[in-house]
Amino acid sequence: MNNRYYQLNKNLIPYKLGCYIPFVVLGDPSIEISLEIIYSLIKNGADGLELGIPFSDPLADGPIIQQANLRAFSANITLTKCFEMLFKIRTHNPKIPIGILIYANLIFKLGIQKFYSICSKIDIDSVLIADVPIEESFEFEQHSIKNNIDSIFVCPPDASKNFLKKLSKHSTGYIYLLSRSGVTGIDMKITPPLKNFVKELKKLTSIPIIQGFGISNENQIKNIILSGVSGVICGSVIIQIIANNLNNKKIMLKKIKKLSNRFKKATII
């Protein structure tokens, strides 16, 4: 629906590049440093952004991202402040695709119509609602269509053919392919390259397939891109750098810059 993801994929394919999309939680460890981190990621290889809206009970996330949510709340983050940050990020870079990951309660509390209207005004590209399955997504989808915002749904690596058909019908922007079942994190093994699975999924959809969950090194990224997906989403490994360097912003930003450049280079096939 929103053409930034389509344009990104179209621009990268001729050069045999996959896209690299980092994930961080807005407001972690503070609003000011969070913005510095995001601007650094944009400058150092990020093709798109996936940004988490802090939530008190993030069921889809492992301990690393849960702690990031807690740090953001300690910095007094609110949904309103998240929108203000997103506006600054969009103003900073009008071209980069920006997706947000959010939990349904936050949308209900604000109001579905108002939420999507604000996202549209900020020029957000996509919304992934972590705890709303396709079967319960109708009302959200209607508002996303009305506001020209892509609906992102996750695809487990063991999904049935019936689910893949449903997924291809409802997904816009891209399909978020999970490396494995469970929660986010960097300590657990990811599923081996899903080449045959990706091949079957591509028969049903032409939108980009982007893989995330547990991706923490260049070899994983290279193998994932070679399996036929369009790109990777990497979060926990970046957020761990934030957690390990809370008392030294300079080192934190230096390590994130280095990692981001390495990960982008790994998408070259």
Curated annotation (Swiss-Prot):
The keyword Lyase applies. InterPro entries: Aldolase_TIM (IPR013785), RibuloseP-bd_barrel (IPR011060), Trp_synthase_alpha_AS (IPR018204), Trp_synthase_suA (IPR002028). GO terms for cellular component: cytosol. The active site is at E50 (proton acceptor), D61 (proton acceptor). Pathway: Amino-acid biosynthesis; L-tryptophan biosynthesis; L-tryptophan from chorismate: step 5/5. It comes from the Bacteria. PROSITE patterns: TRP_SYNTHASE_ALPHA. Its EC number is 4.2.1.20. GO terms for molecular function: tryptophan synthase activity. Tetramer of two alpha and two beta chains. Belongs to the TrpA family. This is Tryptophan synthase alpha chain. It comes from Buchnera aphidicola subsp. Baizongia pistaciae (strain Bp). The lineage of its organism: Bacteria, Pseudomonadati, Pseudomonadota, Gammaproteobacteria, Enterobacterales.
